[in-house]
Each structure stands twice: as structure tokens, then as C-alpha cells.
Amino acid sequence: MLHLLVGLGNPGKEYELTRHNVGFMIIDAIMHHFLFPDFKKKHNALISSGSIRSHKVILAKPYTFMNNSGTPISSIVKLYKIPLDNIIVFHDETDIDFCTIRIKKGGGNAGHNGLKSIDTLLGRDYWRIRFGIGHPSNGYDLSYHVLSQFNNLNAVNNTISNIIEHISLLFENDKSIFKNKVKDLIKYTDISS
């Protein structure tokens, strides 16, 4: 069965390593760790196909900027006939503590424009991995916060490594096992921002 792993972010050098691009960072790390071929631009996204422990996987990074992420994802889903239950979207989340991971299926988009775009074209019945980037301090502009770089990139990379270590659990029916494994590993990692 084919799975689609999507990382949300904005294309361009100026957005690399920003909080809003943590989805792209996760997909890049998965690609390198599991030796996927280089990304090719198709359907307005960067795409690579390979496998993760015998599971066929397409990795995708929409290249339409965050607010229009749904258009390329919808094209990929329709072309490859991927069921919504086999779609996992990695994205930043300001309402979650820094480097905390939450997984859920469906639900609201909490004002995240990338998710809003996907919801509009595909509905909400897909999986989301929410990567906590923390909320800005009082008086700090939210858009500046999400578009600025991480203060503690080591903690981000450690959390991404924890995700990769247990990613094959995402292809199982009970995704809470993945959540618990990653959460337990994060407890023992220095994640102060």
C-alpha cells in the first residue's frame, strides 16, 4: 500500500531552517536517512519515491508556498489514488511547546493556512504530525516568529531524529505507539529554546 508523507513549508533559501519550514526539514531528513532518490519537481511539488522498511512511500514538499499547499497535494493524491488514511502531513504548530510532537487525524486547522488549503481540496480525514515551535513571547509578532530561524537547532534535529527512528510505526493502524515512543525519547532530550 502506498503512503504519502508531506512536509509543509515555503520554497526559497530565505525560508530554510525557519520555524514554518520544519515540515520541509523533516521530509529532507527522511529522504537522506532512508536513501530516497533526489527530489524531482512534479505537480508543483518536490517529490521522491522510495520505501521505508518495506512500505512504499512518496515524499512531497509543495512548491506553491504555504497558503496553496493543497493544490499539489490534491494532484498527487488523485494521480496515485492514495487513500486519505495513508496521508501524513508534517507541519509547525505554535500552540504546542517547542519540540513537542502531537499526532491526530482530522480536526481543525488552528489557523494554519497550509492545512486550510489541504482541507479545502481533500477534506480533513488525513493524519497530521504537529511539531511544536512554541508561541512567541508577549508583544512578539506571530508572523515574524514563524518566519524566523530556530534558536536551538540541536533540539530540533534531535526531535527529527526521534521521529525518523520510529517512523515505520506511522504505517501501523495504532499510531499512538509512534506518539508514545517519540514522546518518551523527547523527555530525555534537552529542548530548552
Curated annotation (Swiss-Prot):
Site positions (Discriminates between blocked and unblocked aminoacyl-tRNA): N10
Domain of life, source organism: Bacteria
Record-given protein name: Peptidyl-tRNA hydrolase
Family as reported in the entry's similarity comment: Belongs to the PTH family.
GO annotation terms (biological process): protein quality control for misfolded or incompletely synthesized proteins; rescue of stalled ribosome
Site (Stabilizes the basic form of H active site to accept a proton): D92
Active site: H20
Catalytic activity: an N-acyl-L-alpha-aminoacyl-tRNA + H2O = an N-acyl-L-amino acid + a tRNA + H(+)
Species lineage: Bacteria, Pseudomonadati, Pseudomonadota, Alphaproteobacteria, Rickettsiales
Compartments it resides in: Cytoplasm
Species assigned in the record: Ehrlichia ruminantium (strain Welgevonden)
Assembly information from the UniProt record: Monomer.
EC number: 3.1.1.29
Coiled coil ranges: none
Positions bound to tRNA: Y15, F65, N67, N113
Cross-referenced PANTHER family: PEPTIDYL-TRNA HYDROLASE (PTHR17224:SF1)
Described function: Hydrolyzes ribosome-free peptidyl-tRNAs (with 1 or more amino acids incorporated), which drop off the ribosome during protein synthesis, or as a result of ribosome stalling. Catalyzes the release of premature peptidyl moieties from peptidyl-tRNA molecules trapped in stalled 50S ribosomal subunits, and thus maintains levels of free tRNAs and 50S ribosomes.
InterPro entries listed in its UniProt record: Pept_tRNA_hydro, Pept_tRNA_hydro_CS, Pept_tRNA_hydro_sf
Alphabetically ordered keywords of this record: Cytoplasm, Hydrolase, RNA-binding, tRNA-binding
Any one GO molecular function term: peptidyl-tRNA hydrolase activity
GO cellular component, one term: cytoplasm
